UniProtKB/Swiss-Prot annotation:
FMN binds at S10, S16, Q17, S18, M93, Y94, N95, F96, T137, R138, G139, G140. Keywords: Flavoprotein, FMN, NAD, Oxidoreductase. Quinone reductase that provides resistance to thiol-specific stress caused by electrophilic quinones. Also exhibits azoreductase activity. Catalyzes the reductive cleavage of the azo bond in aromatic azo compounds to the corresponding amines. Homodimer. InterPro entries: Flavodoxin_fold (IPR003680), Flavoprotein-like_sf (IPR029039), FMN-dep_NADH:Q_OxRdtase_AzoR1 (IPR050104), NADH:quinone_OxRdtase_FMN_depd (IPR023048). Its cofactor is FMN. Transmembrane segments: none annotated. It comes from the Bacteria. This is FMN-dependent NADH:quinone oxidoreductase. Gene3D superfamilies: 3.40.50.360. It is an enzyme of class 1 (oxidoreductase). Belongs to the azoreductase type 1 family. HAMAP family: Azoreductase_type1.
């Protein structure tokens, strides 16, 4: 049995296609005996990184209450990531990129000296032994093209903190008519059955 951390980031709630796919996947994993923790980053938004929070994430003795709160939240998010075997990220494409809600999580988790460090050979990720899966939904078709700033970015960030074993599931063409959308969802379900 595995411990899985799922990050949902769609702002569309019940209308979210990535949310429906991830909910089906979570139900199947729980039925197989896995422990799944779901963090809905849109329903419970995290603070947006600003100068005060960024400064506070470095720690120190004279932190403001807001900085102390952000540092404690960052520590909790990192601890949550560390205790799970697998990270699953539901990442819809919004205007060629990831949702702000997901970026907020990244900004609180990617911390020098905590989840990565700089060495003479370059940066080294400190989150080791984890596997990740990205489930990305898009209105158009972007896989493997220069317009996909979701998957390459997320793989870079995850690799930077040490998570390099990453599978990707694509649901594309979801705004290109009912038949294309149905095909896109079916393809994603088929991919999930293979990698999930």
């Amino acid at each position: 049995m595995s411990k899985v951390l799922v990050l949902k980031s769609s702002i569309l709630g019940d209308f979210s296609q990535s949310g429906r796919l991830i909910d089906e996947w979570v139900a199947a994993r729980r039925a197989s005996g896995d422990t799944v923790t779901v963090r809905d980053l849109a329903a419970e938004p995290l603070p947006v990184l600003d100068g005060e929070i960024a400064s506070g994430l470095r720690g120190g003795e004279s932190l403001s209450p807001r900085q102390q709160e952000a540092l404690a939240l960052s520590d909790a998010l990192i601890a949550e990531l560390k205790v799970h075997d697998q990270l699953v990220v539901a990442a819809p494409m919004y205007n060629f990129s990831i949702p702000t809600q997901l970026k907020n999580w990244i900004d609180l988790v990617a911390r020098a000296g905590v989840t990565f460090t700089y060495t003479a050979e370059g940066p080294q990720g400190l989150i080791q032994g984890k596997q990740a899966m990205l489930i990305t939904t898009r209105g158009g078709v972007h896989k493997g093209s220069g317009s996909d700033h979701v998957v390459p970015y997320l793989k870079t960030v995850l690799g930077f903190i040490g998570i390099t074993d990453v599978d990707t599931v694509y649901a594309e063409a979801l705004s290109m008519g009912p038949e294309a959308a149905e095909r896109g969802i079916k393809d994603a379900r088929d991919q999930l059955a293979l990698v999930g």
